[in-house]
């Protein structure tokens, strides 16, 4: 069975966005872009929530086709971004959207909700990892069903103070696989998940 692997950029206090969804704390460099490239190289399917998918579909396809980065470009080398864009452009993309209204992109499959059986069937298909980005509601639903196998957290050296936390329920079932510092001060923390939520684990 293949894995669902989550990649998330977070603050030291566990937020993926500050107040009003502000993201000024993000840091980026060639090392971090190389990580993002290796993350998608290990996958053949991408999994998104609607908002994150729409952000990706507006930013990356033009780069894959040779355009320059548009408004609010990521602080990473353009040629590395272009390589990443060309890698993800043809990949299968699964989007969870209750409305079904998503931006156009290649090879997109829309799910109206998280169905644990459907997700397990997807994981049983032959292939490489399923790389997951964004959407707190999708992330939390999958985590509650124990369907995220690995977490790759890019921990930034800053505190949001308040904002959107990665989790809003206790999960203590992660095991550290590796920790790697970047020159930017960001720490890449890779964890594997054991099965079950914290409550289920404590009930054993």
Locations of the language-model features?
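Enzymes that bind and transform nitrogen-containing heteroaromatic metabolites
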Residues: 1-204
